[in-house]
UniProtKB/Swiss-Prot annotation:
Keyword annotations from UniProtKB, A to Z: ATP-binding, Cell cycle, Cell division, Cell shape, Cell wall biogenesis/degradation, Cytoplasm, Ligase, Nucleotide-binding, Peptidoglycan synthesis
Organism, as annotated: Acinetobacter baumannii (strain AB307-0294)
Pathway: Cell wall biogenesis; peptidoglycan biosynthesis
Record HAMAP family: MurD (MF_00639)
GO molecular function terms listed in the Swiss-Prot or TrEMBL record: ATP binding; UDP-N-acetylmuramoylalanine-D-glutamate ligase activity
Protein name per UniProt: UDP-N-acetylmuramoylalanine--D-glutamate ligase
Pfam family, one: Mur_ligase_C
Record localization: Cytoplasm
EC number: 6.3.2.9
Binding site for ATP: 112-118
Classification via SUPFAM superfamilies: MurCD N-terminal domain, MurD-like peptide ligases, catalytic domain, MurD-like peptide ligases, peptide-binding domain
Keyword check for Cytoplasm: yes
GO-annotated cellular components: cytoplasm
Function noted in UniProt: Cell wall formation. Catalyzes the addition of glutamate to the nucleotide precursor UDP-N-acetylmuramoyl-L-alanine (UMA).
Length: 448
C-alpha cells in the first residue's frame, strides 16, 4: 500500500502526456484523479487501479477539489473550468513542471516555430555519441516524465508553446528559441501571446543560444547569462555562422575557424546549415567535444518528412517536406534549397496546399519569385494561396498528389529540385502529414 502524499492531484486531459503524468504521480504515492471531456479518451485503459476517473466532460467539481491540476498540453488554460480553479487559487502546471521538480538533471531545452524536432534529435545524437547517458523527448517521441526511468545524466527536451504555457522556472542548462513565425494563433490569441509562451523557456536558464537572423528569438535575460548566437552570416569571435571561400565553398564556422563544409553534410539546404549551427552552439554549452559533434553531423540523415531527400530522377532531386505545415516552415525549405541550388542555376518546383489554418500566405511571395519556376497547388485552400502569390511565378493546379508530382516532373530539368512543402495541414486529402509524405514518396518512386 502506497502512503498517500499531500492533497489531490487532478490530471486534466489524457493522451500521451496525461497518461504519463497519472502514472508518475501514482508511483510517487500521490492521491490522483483524472478528468477528460471525451467519453473514452486515448490511454483510458492505461490508468492504474485506485485512480478516480471522470470522463465525458471536464469535471468542474473534481477540479475544484484539487490541490493542484496537471493540465495536458492539448487543453488551453483559458478554458472556463480551468479558469474557475485558478480563481480559487489552485495551482495549474504541466508535465514539464513536474519533471523539473522531480529531478535536477541538466536540461537542454529547445523550442521554435520550426526545426525543433531536427535540432532536438541531432543534439541528442551528439550527446550520445560523445558518451553521455542522454534521454530525448518531450513534445517529440517519449513524454518527458517517462524519460526519468532511464536515469539519464542529461535530458534533451523539445518543448511546444502549449507545454511552456504551464511551465515556470525551467532552469535549463541551456535554452534556445530557434525561430519565430506565425503558428497556433488560434490558441495564443496573437503573435505576442505566442512569443510570451515560447520565451518562458528562458526562465532561470544558465546559458542561452539564440538565432541572430531572427530578432524574435533573442531573449531578455540578465546580462550575466552567457549567450551564444548562430546565424547564416559571418560570425563574430566565439559565435557560430558561415564563411564563404572565393570559389563559393560554404563552411560552417566558429568565429574565424572553419569547421566543416556544408557540402559534407547529408542534410542539405541553408535552413539545415542553421540547424547544424544551433546544435554546435548547444553542444558547446554542455561541454561536448567539437570533433565528436562534427562526426555526428556528417552521419546525420535528417528526419522523415522534414526536407527529406527522396531520390534523384533524370538529374532532378525530390524532397519530402510534408511536415512543413505552416508558412514559416515552407519559407525555410524554399530559401534553404533555393539558395543551395542557385549556384548551378537550379530552380524549385513547389507543391503547396491543403488546409491553411487561416494563415497569411503573402510572406511566401518573394521567395517563390526568387527561387521557384513553378508552383503546383493542391487541396482545399488552393484558391486562397493562389490569390496571395498570383504573378510571382507560373501556377498550376492538380486534383491529386500524383498529378502534382507528374506536373513537376514535366516542368523541371537537370539541377532543379521538386519540393513538397505544403505550408498547410493535411486533413483535407490525407490522414496526417505522415500519410501525405508517404504518398509523395510512393509517387516519386513510381516516376519513370
Amino acid at each position: 500500500m502506497l502512503i498517500q502524499r499531500g492533497g489531490l492531484k487532478v490530471v486534466a486531459g489524457l493522451g500521451i502526456s496525461g497518461v504519463s503524468a497519472v502514472n508518475f504521480l501514482h508511483e510517487q504515492g500521490y492521491q490522483v484523479a483524472v478528468t477528460d471531456s471525451r467519453p473514452t479518451p486515448p490511454g483510458h485503459d492505461q490508468i492504474p487501479a485506485g485512480v478516480k476517473t471522470s470522463f465525458g466532460q471536464l469535471d468542474q467539481e473534481l477540479l475544484l477539489q484539487a490541490e493542484e491540476i496537471i493540465l495536458s498540453p492539448g487543453l488551453a488554460p483559458q478554458l472556463p473550468e480551468i479558469q474557475a480553479a485558478i480563481a480559487k487559487g489552485i495551482s495549474v502546471v504541466g508535465d514539464i513542471q513536474l519533471l523539473r521538480r522531480a529531478t535536477d538533471v541538466p536540461i537542454v531545452a529547445i523550442t521554435g516555430s520550426n526545426a525543433k524536432s531536427t535540432v532536438t534529435t541531432l543534439i541528442g545524437l551528439m550527446a550520445k555519441d560523445a558518451g553521455k547517458k542522454v534521454a530525448v523527448g518531450g513534445n517529440l517521441g517519449r513524454p518527458a516524465l517517462d524519460l526519468l526511468k532511464d536515469q539519464p545524466e542529461l535530458l534533451v527536451l523539445e518543448l511546444s508553446s502549449f507545454q511552456l504555457e504551464t511551465t515556470s522556472h525551467l532552469n535549463a542548462e541551456v535554452a534556445v528559441v530557434l525561430n519565430m513565425s506565425e503558428d497556433h494563433l488560434d490558441r495564443h490569441g496573437n503573435m505576442l501571446g505566442y512569443h510570451q509562451a515560447k520565451h518562458r523557456i528562458f526562465q532561470g536558464a544558465k546559458k542561452v543560444v539564440f538565432n541572430r537572423d531572427d530578432a524574435l528569438s533573442r531573449p531578455l535575460v540578465p546580462d550575466t547569462t552567457p549567450m551564444q548566437s548562430f546565424g547564416l552570416n559571418a560570425p563574430d569571435l566565439n559565435q557560430y555562422g558561415v564563411l564563404r571561400d572565393a570559389d563559393g565553398t560554404l563552411w560552417l564556422a566558429r568565429g574565424l575557424q572553419r569547421l566543416i563544409k556544408s557540402s559534407d553534410l547529408y542534410i542539405q539546404g541553408m535552413h539545415n546549415v542553421a540547424n547544424a549551427l544551433a546544435c554546435l552552439a548547444l553542444g558547446e554549452a554542455i561541454g561536448l567535444p567539437m570533433e565528436s559533434m562534427l562526426e555526428t553531423l556528417k552521419q546525420f540523415k535528417g528526419l522523415e518528412h522534414r526536407c527529406e531527400y527522396v531520390k534523384t530522377v533524370h538529374d532532378v532531386r525530390y524532397y519530402n517536406d510534408s511536415k512543413g505545415t505552416n508558412v514559416g516552415a515552407t519559407l525555410a525549405a524554399i530559401d534553404g534549397l533555393g539558395a543551395a541550388i542557385e549556384v548551378k542555376k537550379g530552380k524549385v518546383a513547389l507543391i503547396l496546399g491543403g488546409q491553411g489554418k487561416g494563415q497569411d500566405f503573402g510572406p511566401l511571395r518573394s521567395s517563390i519569385e526568387k527561387y521557384a519556376k513553378v508552383v503546383v497547388l493542391i487541396g482545399e485552400d488552393a484558391p486562397v494561396i493562389e490569390q496571395a502569390i498570383q504573378g510571382a511565378t507560373k501556377i498550376l493546379h492538380a486534383a491529386t498528389l500524383k498529378e502534382a508530382v507528374e506536373l513537376c516532373q514535366r516542368e523541371t530539368q537537370a539541377e532543379d529540385v521538386v519540393l513538397l512543402s505544403p505550408a498547410c495541414a493535411s486533413f483535407d486529402m490525407f490522414k496526417s502529414y505522415n500519410d501525405r509524405g508517404q504518398q509523395f514518396v510512393a509517387c516519386v518512386n513510381s516516376l519513370v
